């Protein structure tokens, strides 16, 4: 009873922090100058992390097993994983764009957990026989950590694509405007003002330099985080295969969850392969990561909607 009450309190605190965090996050998206608000949002993520840690420990204590037996608990662990990834750049006081991705991921995932959509799964139950194994912690935790890292890395790649294509569209529109107005009186007058041209060129060059630096940093950090996630995912799949052989007598059964996990692994293996070729780095590899981002959500969330296969104990119904 004490553990249940504590979990209830931590859930409400977490929900309050998430609500405040989402509000602050949306405000900082429109008003970049309010630095104090952004810092408050980041501290809110740390508070949410502590609450999630307390939730997981409390749930583990009164259920008697590691809390990764259904979608609700795995989403809790996913939020916790996002927060862990968030801690590294936060305490080093660098890479604010990485922290923006991880903090927003933590806030919105935890918001989904506390939204009430998964209320039927919040009550801890006795594990089904297939899950009563020491492999539960190893397999599921590695898979969820892998998903968290891959999602964060993929979102950095998405940010890279947005910046790159916005730049391409801007250049294209400027070329059209130049062709349209190249013989106008305003253009001729502008050409007669060399000082303005020099100032404008200097500003554009500086802006392009910082944009190029940002794209390069996004590309580098995306590659690092995805590489880490790929390692976690590989360990998770291998440990799951060993567990499946013990539980069902076969290392691989090609049920929907296993199939999409393999597709996810293959997609990010392709991503890492493209990184070995300098001609396919940056934008091309980011496109692969974006496709991987979609596939992860199909594997992690979409397959659970089917409620079929050997992993059907993690399914849920929206009603």
From Swiss-Prot:
GO terms for cellular component: chloroplast thylakoid membrane; plasma membrane. InterPro entries: Cyt_c_assembly, Cyt_c_biogenesis_CcsA, Cyt_c_biogenesis_CcsA/CcmC. The keyword Nucleotide-binding does not apply. Pfam families: Cytochrom_C_asm (PF01578). GO terms for molecular function: heme binding. It is found in: Plastid, Chloroplast thylakoid membrane. It is a multi-pass membrane protein. Keywords: Chloroplast, Cytochrome c-type biogenesis, Membrane, Plastid, Thylakoid, Transmembrane, Transmembrane helix. NCBIfam families: cytochr_II_ccsB. Required during biogenesis of c-type cytochromes (cytochrome c6 and cytochrome f) at the step of heme attachment. May interact with Ccs1. This is Cytochrome c biogenesis protein CcsA. It comes from Oenothera glazioviana (Large-flowered evening primrose).
